[in-house]
């Protein structure tokens, strides 16, 4: 098989196999080919991984942030040196075009290692608090063993986004990738060892829905970081709460992207397409509710159709391909069910909605799809589809669109396109979301915090802010004189 790893799991610095686990077949979405066969972690494998992480963490935490950061920066260098190899693996794992993975996936992971490796000495600090004769100080200390649970849309990126802040803060990690995309995280673990990371600090275990509870409920786990759906998030949160564990969650969204009539039309359409079709629409922060002011609705839709129909769909390994297949048959079928629901509820299909003609019949392809005349109560305007389906809604004025944009249980992201920056800042202040863009969309450099509100989760990935979620504050009071007691 073309992408078979040495073994299913990576624990304590080496590959580990246990064929007693449930079989996981890694399928290349473009052709339906089985490219690797792995095994889900048994309870014994989970125990082995957590034991390794627990054993290795104290010595790692005793190292200086500079020393820890140096190893992460070396891992970033190795990832960049092997960007082509890692990008091709990511394409096999996910079906995303190589045109995309080579600029957005391993490189983003490398950015994370480099960023956190660089800021650790300055960011992992505390405060000095004078108290007259006495004084106090605070320091940030690691939590211990952290569990990362990844999603299938950006497997390598997520493995790094969770691993980098955890490791540089002095923690160890056990990472479980999605069973749909099991391959990339194993390579990340290999590279970290090559970069000099001590054994046991970054472990990868494969698994399905039954594996998560084994990790989350383990008494030696101090922290859980999840990227996934809202239903999964609720289950993980409930389990983690029973053990009073630290939790951060980046969950789903149904984000609004608002286009006012003074916006640059081409830029707004470009932003809407990035926010709906990149990664074949499988991005949690996508702006899938595109609100267009009525004055420009027809011109917006006409040009949007032209540009959408020109998207190149095909073999993900062809660098000319702009849109690849869905990650799995199950996900494609789910998206098709939403398309049918949109039609039946009265939305107007502008373009797409079917299977492209020029692709493998065994691939999980779907055309980029645009619906117009969508109303707020329609299913496709309320539920996260997680596929290349854009819903265009129209609006009259600012107050109306802000109220409608906020009328959702989600709060991950939002975007505003307008030439009036005063209005832009006023609108984003009123939008209920954690990550917002003005006159662009879906740009997430590691320097800025990323995360949501409401049912879209809590906590933040990236930026120095992320380190707060992988450390806790220790306060030390220093008495400088005799102790006075009333007895």
Swiss-Prot record:
Pfam families assigned to the protein according to its UniProt record, in alphabetical order: Aldedh (PF00171)
Alphabetical UniProt keywords: Metal-binding, NAD, NADP, Oxidation, Oxidoreductase, Potassium
Cofactor note: Binds 2 potassium ions per subunit.
SUPFAM superfamilies, A to Z: ALDH-like
Record has Oxidoreductase as a keyword: yes
Binding, NAD(+): 150-152, 176-179, 229-232, 252, 284, 384
EC code: 1.2.1.8
CDD domains xref list: ALDH_F9_TMBADH
UniProt KW NADP keyword: yes
UniProt pathway annotation: Amine and polyamine biosynthesis; betaine biosynthesis via choline pathway; betaine from betaine aldehyde: step 1/1
Gene3D superfamilies: Aldehyde Dehydrogenase, Chain A, domain 1 (3.40.605.10), Aldehyde Dehydrogenase, Chain A, domain 2 (3.40.309.10)
Cofactor list: K(+)
BP term (GO), one: glycine betaine biosynthetic process from choline
Cysteine sulfenic acid (-SOH): residues bearing it: 284
Annotated residues for binding of K(+) 2: 244, 454, 457
HAMAP family attached to this UniProt entry: BADH
PANTHER family on file: ALDEHYDE DEHYDROGENASE-RELATED
Protein name as catalogued: Betaine aldehyde dehydrogenase
């Amino acid at each position: 098989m073309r992408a078979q790893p040495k073994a299913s799991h990576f624990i304590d610095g080496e590959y580990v196999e246990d064929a007693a686990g449930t079989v996981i077949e890694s399928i290349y979405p473009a052709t339906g080919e089985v490219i690797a066969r792995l095994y889900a972690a048994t309870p014994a494998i989970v125990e082995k991984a957590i034991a390794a992480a627990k054993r290795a963490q104290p010595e790692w935490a005793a190292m200086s942030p500079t020393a820890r950061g140096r190893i992460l920066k070396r891992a970033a260098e190795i990832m960049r040196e092997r960007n082509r190899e890692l990008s091709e693996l990511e394409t096999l794992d996910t079906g995303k075009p190589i045109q995309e993975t080579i600029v957005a996936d391993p490189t983003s992971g490398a950015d994370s290692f480099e960023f956190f490796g660089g800021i650790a000495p300055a960011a992992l600090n505390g405060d000095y608090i004078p108290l007259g004769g006495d004084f106090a100080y605070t320091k940030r200390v690691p939590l211990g063993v952290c569990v990362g649970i990844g999603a299938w849309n950006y497997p390598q990126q997520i493995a790094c986004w969770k691993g980098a802040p955890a490791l540089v803060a002095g923690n160890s990690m056990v990472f479980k990738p999605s069973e749909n995309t099991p391959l990339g995280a194993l390579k990340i673990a290999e590279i970290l060892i090559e970069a000099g990371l001590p054994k046991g600090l970054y472990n990868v275990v494969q698994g399905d829905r039954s594996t998560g509870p084994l990790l989350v409920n383990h008494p030696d786990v101090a922290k859980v970081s999840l990227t996934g759906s809202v239903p999964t998030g609720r289950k993980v949160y409930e389990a983690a709460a029973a053990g009073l564990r630290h939790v951060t969650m980046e969950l789903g969204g149904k984000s609004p992207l608002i286009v006012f009539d003074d916006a640059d039309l081409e830029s707004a359409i470009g932003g809407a397409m990035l926010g709906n079709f990149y990664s074949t629409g499988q991005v949690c922060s996508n702006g899938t509710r595109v609100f267009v002011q009525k004055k420009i609705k027809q011109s917006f839709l006409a040009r949007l159709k032209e540009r959408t129909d020109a998207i190149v769909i095909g073999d993900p390994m062809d660098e000319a391909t702009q849109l690849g297949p869905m990650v799995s048959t199950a996900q494609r079928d789910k998206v098709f069910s939403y398309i049918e629901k949109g039609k039946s509820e009265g939305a107007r299909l502008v373009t797409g909605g079917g299977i492209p003609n020029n692709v493998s019949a065994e691939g999980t392809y779907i055309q980029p799809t645009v619906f117009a005349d969508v109303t707020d109560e329609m299913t496709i305007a309320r539920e996260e589809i997680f596929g290349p389906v854009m819903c265009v809604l129209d609006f009259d004025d600012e107050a109306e669109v802000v109220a409608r944009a906020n009328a959702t249980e989600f709060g991950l992201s939002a975007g505003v396109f307008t030439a009036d920056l005063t209005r832009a800042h006023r609108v984003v202040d009123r939008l209920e979301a954690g990550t917002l863009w003005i006159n662009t969309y879906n740009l997430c450099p590691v320097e800025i915090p990323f995360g949501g509100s409401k049912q879209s989760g809590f906590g933040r990935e990236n930026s120095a802010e992320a380190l707060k979620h992988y450390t806790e504050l220790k306060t030390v009071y220093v008495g400088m004189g005799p102790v006075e007691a009333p007895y």
